[in-house]
Every structure is written in C-alpha cells, then in structure tokens.
C-alpha cells in the first residue's frame, strides 16, 4: 500500500462526509464537493476518519494514495478553501473584475475577458494582482493556469502573468 494511503483523513467538526458506493460527497461551511472514486480503491468512513485501501486482490496500490489525496483536498476545500494569487508584471498590464469574469489588458491589441467557471470567485486587490478562491483545488489551479497561459512570464524582462510565489529564471541579453 502507498505511504500516502496509510494515513487516514481526519474529518474536522462541521464537515459531513457521505459515501454511496464509489461516490463520496463532502459538505462543509464553504460548500459541497462530490467525486467518483476509482473502483480499485475501497473507502471506509468511521470514527471521524476516512480510510483508503486498495480493493481486495487488486495490485493498484498507487490508486489508493491518489484517492486519499483527492479526498483530503475535498475536506480541506469545504472547510478552509483554496486560493491562488497571480501577479501581472509589465507596463500597462492590468486586471479588473467584469461581471462573472476577469477583464485583462496584457499588451494585445484587444482586451481579454476570461470567464470564471461556477465555484471560482476572483478579486483584484490592485490592478496588477488577482486572487482566485474556490473549494475545489483542481479547479482554482486550472483557472490560474489558463490566465497565466495568456501571457506567461518571459525570461529576458520578466514581463507577463506569474503566480505570486513563482521565481522567474532570468536570462542575460545577447552581447554585441
């Protein structure tokens, strides 16, 4: 069995977990998440803990660790939530909230409007910062990657959209 799967997931107070065959639903203060778990993994809820183990006779131990990590992210998401911060670096690079999307000015001849999926909220503390929040870790990371993909940071001047904790590797300009 994988090392990750050996540790049970603790269910904090205020979080309700229901298991229906291979579908697990986690409800908490920030919302509700549902996921279908791989059939090669058996999930048991007991004593305010969730335990994942490979199903009997199946050799896919790695799936148990993956299922445990996904369930842990669901529990943390509905209890605390996840956030991802993006920073815009460059002259004239700006962001603002526009309805259910983010209006981005990234040096193109036209402004970009990125529509946010259900479950993700955004706020702009300043014109060059975006904070994405959600209960779903995968979804908030996907939206952040899509926004970063419009103008990834380039290595010579460092301009572009970057994660707040990202270190951009800089290159030296060509010498004459």
Curated annotation (Swiss-Prot):
Gene Ontology biological-process entries: cytoplasmic translation
Region feature (Disordered): 151-176
Transmembrane feature ranges: none
Keyword annotations from UniProtKB, A to Z: Ribonucleoprotein, Ribosomal protein, RNA-binding, rRNA-binding
Composition bias type Basic and acidic residues, residue spans: 151-170
Highest taxon of the lineage: Bacteria
Leader sequence residues: none
GO molecular function, one term: structural constituent of ribosome
Gene Ontology CC terms: cytosolic large ribosomal subunit
Pfam families named among the record's database cross-references: Ribosomal_L6
Self-association state and partner proteins as the record states: Part of the 50S ribosomal subunit.
Function of the protein: This protein binds to the 23S rRNA, and is important in its secondary structure. It is located near the subunit interface in the base of the L7/L12 stalk, and near the tRNA binding site of the peptidyltransferase center.
Family recorded in the similarity comment: Belongs to the universal ribosomal protein uL6 family.
UniProt-listed HAMAP family: Ribosomal_uL6_B
Protein name: Large ribosomal subunit protein uL6
Species for this entry: Shewanella loihica (strain ATCC BAA-1088 / PV-4)
Gene for this chain: rplF
